[in-house]
Regions:
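Bacterial Sec-dependent N-terminal signal peptides
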Residues: 1-22
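A flexible loop/linker signature enriched in serine peptidases of the S9 family
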Residues: 20-24, 42-48, 61-68, 80-92, ...
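Short N-terminal segments immediately surrounding and downstream of signal-peptide cleavage
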Residues: 21-35
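Signature of short aromatic-glycine-proline-rich micro-motifs recurring in repeat-based ectodomains
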Residues: 27, 306-315
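Conserved beta-strand position repeated across blades of beta-propeller domains
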Residues: 31, 71, 115-117, 161, ...
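Residue-level detector of Asp-centered blade-edge/turn motifs that repeat once per structural unit
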Residues: 34-35, 74-75, 118-119, 164-165, ...
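Glycine/alanine-rich phosphate-binding loops at beta-alpha junctions
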Residues: 57
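Short, solvent-exposed beta-strand-terminating loops
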Residues: 286-292
């Protein structure tokens, strides 16, 4: 008996571990804490965080709508993100450890978070409130957002990222690095470059002049610049500047997305093939982060189902003792006198249309749409098969 219990316990533990350790896909828009030990990302419309070492992820948000564009403040205390609780994207912040969420912007236009100021007191974001898209910043205490470049520069500026010491604001200003970022191999007059503008000195600087795509500059606290380009092999890869020279860091044959360096430097996280990867600057290599999604499981709740006035099709069994019928797409069986009614779980969310008893008085024939086609199926009247 003890041996049997031990085997059962081991089997359950192995099954639980297998379920929890399966690698997750469709993770997006990652960022890192300043020390590079924790990754924050979007999954199934919510924000999650995971320990880089063991990959175990827990949910941070459960708001209505999608939460995206998470960015951790340089001091490691806050997460800024875009939330769509009211339909359009607004800027929100919350503690890195989880806790109270505070809304910072309230405009009916979309506000997409880009990055933090290095003092961790304000957030850069892109908004369509005055044009097709422009860069703004807002205090963590709220208040009226301020347009970063004023009213006379770069009418489509986005991907804003502040240099830690020079005062430069790095940005892109073409739709090819915004709503057409998925269009690879583009070469033409609207190609994005790595460029910056200093609002204090009013000096503009362009760092790249490749006819293809260079975009998404991200900087660490030492001013090291990382960005995405498709110059080497027509696929988006991670690049940096080595003594001012554009230098590839990865040579993937499938494109990366949304690269962000940690504030302290040394780690760059990004998306690739629907999973998360991290590039180690010192080791000069990228590795996949094995993220394990740990969900808060729920137990489905039984609901009352009123069939009165909602019966659409029925059939009496050959022995005259039972009645099968459909109501709101579900199958029910009752005795002919209506003393009991039982729902038959058909194992599909598709609605059943018609029911018919077979001659054995135990089997029900019904039709429903599966895979786009209407077909016939059978099910036991007691719901056992």
């Amino acid at each position: 008996m003890k041996k049997l219990l031990a085997i059962a316990a081991f089997s359950f533990s192995a099954l639980f571990a297998s379920a929890q350790n399966s690698e997750a896909y469709f993770l997006s828009q990652p960022c890192l804490t300043p020390d590079g030990q924790t990754v924050v990302f979007s999954f199934e419309g919510d924000l999650w965080k995971a320990d880089v070492a063991n990959g175990n992820a827990t949910r941070l948000t459960a708001m209505q709508g999608y939460e995206t564009n998470a960015r951790v403040s340089p001091d490691g205390k806050w997460i800024a993100f875009s939330g769509r609780q009211y339909g359009n994207a607004d800027v929100y912040i919350m503690p890195v450890a989880g806790g109270e969420i505070k809304q910072l912007t309230y405009h009916s236009a979309g506000d997409e978070v880009s990055s933090w100021g290095w003092d961790s007191k304000y957030i850069y974001f892109t908004s369509t409130r005055e044009s097709r898209g422009s860069g703004y910043k807002v205090s963590i205490n709220g208040g009226t957002p301020v347009r970063v470049f004023g009213n006379y520069f770069f009418q489509y500026d986005h991907n804003l990222f502040e240099h830690p010491s020079s005062g430069e604001i790095f940005f892109n200003d073409t739709w090819e690095s915004s709503n057409q970022v998925q269009r690879k191999h583009y070469k033409g007059p609207f190609n994005p470059d790595i460029q910056s503008y200093n609002p204090a000195t009013k000096k503009y600087k362009r760092y790249t002049d490749y006819i293809g795509k260079d975009f998404g500059a991200t900087l660490d606290k030492k001013g090291n610049i990382f960005f995405i380009s498709d110059e080497a092999n027509n696929e988006y890869n991670l690049y940096t500047f080595d003594n001012g020279k554009k230098t590839p860091l990865t040579t993937f044959n499938s494109s990366i997305k949304n690269a962000i360096v940690n504030a302290d430097g040394g780690k760059v996280v990004f998306e690739k093939d629907y999973q998360l990867y991290m590039y180690d600057v010192a080791a000069k290599k990228a590795e996949k982060l094995k993220i394990n999604i740990i969900r808060n499981s729920i137990l489905s709740k039984e609901k009352d189902f009123d069939v009165k006035g909602n019966i659409t099709n029925f059939d009496v069994s050959p022995d005259g003792k039972k009645l099968a019928f459909t109501s709101r797409g579900e199958i029910f069986v009752s005795d002919v006198e209506g003393k009991f009614i039982e729902q038959i779980k058909k194992g599909s969310a598709e609605r059943a249309l018609e029911v018919k008893w077979l001659s054995d008085n135990k089997t029900i024939l019904f039709n429903q749409t599966v895979g786009g086609f209407l077909n016939w199926f059978t099910i036991a009247a007691d719901g056992t098969a």
